[in-house]
From Swiss-Prot:
Residues 214-243 are annotated as: Disordered. This is Small ribosomal subunit protein uS3. GO terms for biological process: apoptotic process; base-excision repair; cell division; cellular response to hydrogen peroxide; cellular response to reactive oxygen species; cellular response to tumor necrosis factor; chromosome segregation; cytoplasmic translation. Methylation by PRMT1 is required for import into the nucleolus and for ribosome assembly. Residues 231-243 have a biased composition (Pro residues). It comes from Homo sapiens. Its main location: cytoplasm. InterPro entries: KH_dom-like_a/b, KH_dom_type_2, KH_sf_prok-type, Ribosomal_S3_C_sf, Ribosomal_uS3_C, Ribosomal_uS3_CS, Ribosomal_uS3_euk/arc. The modification N-acetylalanine is found at A2. There is a cross-link at K90, K202, K214 (Glycyl lysine isopeptide (Lys-Gly) (interchain with G-Cter in ubiquitin)).
Length: 243
C-alpha cells in the first residue's frame, strides 16, 4: 500500500534523494570524469542517468560496475527489485562542463603541476571549447604558510540577474595536498545556442539581433500606375414631366 505524502514533503524527499545520490556518485566515480546525474521517474521504474566523460570506465568490464552501482543504490534507497535502472551517458562537450573541469584541475594539482600552469591550461581548454567566458579561483596555502587566493579570468562573465541561473555553470572541489587543503572553484559562461545542445536556447536580455533587409525587386520596364480618384456619385433619376 502506497503511503500518501503532501506535495511539500514529496519535493523535500526528492531533493534529499538527488543530493545523496549525487554525493555518492561523486565519491565513487571521481576518477571517471563524473559530471552530474539525471533522475527520470516513470510509473513502472526509476531511470538514473550518470553523465561522465569516460563512460566505458563507469560501465566496467561487461557492465559489471554499473550492475554493482545499481545494487548499491537499490539497497541504500529501498527501491523494489528491478525498479531502478542505471545508464551511463557521455558528456557531449567536456570543456563546457564545470564539474569535469574542476575534477581535471584537481588531478593536475595532485600530480604536482604548478598552480598557475594548471589553471591556465584549464582556462585555455574551456575557451577553445566555445565558452563565452570562464573564471577559475584557487585558494589556500599556495606558497608559504599564509593562505591566499588566485583568480584567473578570460572572456565575458555575468554575476547577477536571472540569466546567471541558466548561463553560468559552477563547480567547487577540494584537493588535499602536503601543505593543506586547496579550494577550487570553476565558473563557465555557456554560449547561446538556439538548438539547446551546448548552451541555453534563451538569448541574453541585452542580446541585439540585426535583421537583414529584404532584397527589393527593381522594375526592369517602365510601369504607369493609375490611381483611382474619388468615385462619382450616382446620377439622381430625373422626374418625368406629366402632361
Amino acid at each position: 500500500m502506497a503511503v500518501q505524502i503532501s506535495k511539500k514533503r514529496k519535493f523535500v524527499a526528492d531533493g534529499i534523494f538527488k543530493a545523496e545520490l549525487n554525493e555518492f556518485l561523486t565519491r565513487e566515480l571521481a576518477e571517471d570524469g563524473y559530471s552530474g546525474v539525471e533522475v527520470r521517474v516513470t510509473p513502472t521504474r526509476t531511470e538514473i542517468i550518470i553523465l561522465a566523460t569516460r563512460t566505458q570506465n563507469v560501465l566496467g568490464e561487461k557492465g559489471r560496475r554499473i550492475r554493482e552501482l545499481t545494487a548499491v543504490v537499490q539497497k541504500r534507497f529501498g527501491f523494489p527489485e528491478g525498479s531502478v535502472e542505471l545508464y551511463a551517458e557521455k558528456v557531449a562537450t567536456r570543456g563546457l562542463c564545470a564539474i569535469a573541469q574542476a575534477e581535471s584541475l584537481r588531478y593536475k594539482l595532485l600530480g604536482g603541476l604548478a598552480v598557475r600552469r594548471a589553471c591556465y591550461g584549464v582556462l585555455r581548454f574551456i575557451m577553445e571549447s566555445g565558452a563565452k567566458g570562464c573564471e577559475v579561483v584557487v585558494s589556500g596555502k599556495l606558497r608559504g604558510q599564509r593562505a591566499k587566493s588566485m583568480k584567473f579570468v578570460d572572456g565575458l562573465m555575468i554575476h547577477s540577474g536571472d540569466p546567471v541561473n541558466y548561463y553560468v555553470d559552477t563547480a567547487v572541489r577540494h584537493v588535499l595536498l602536503r601543505q593543506g587543503v586547496l579550494g577550487i572553484k570553476v565558473k563557465i559562461m555557456l554560449p547561446w545556442d538556439p538548438t539547446g545542445k551546448i548552451g541555453p536556447k534563451k538569448p541574453l536580455p541585452d542580446h541585439v539581433s540585426i535583421v537583414e533587409p529584404k532584397d527589393e525587386i527593381l522594375p526592369t520596364t517602365p510601369i504607369s500606375e493609375q490611381k483611382g480618384g474619388k468615385p462619382e456619385p450616382p446620377a439622381m433619376p430625373q422626374p418625368v414631366p406629366t402632361a
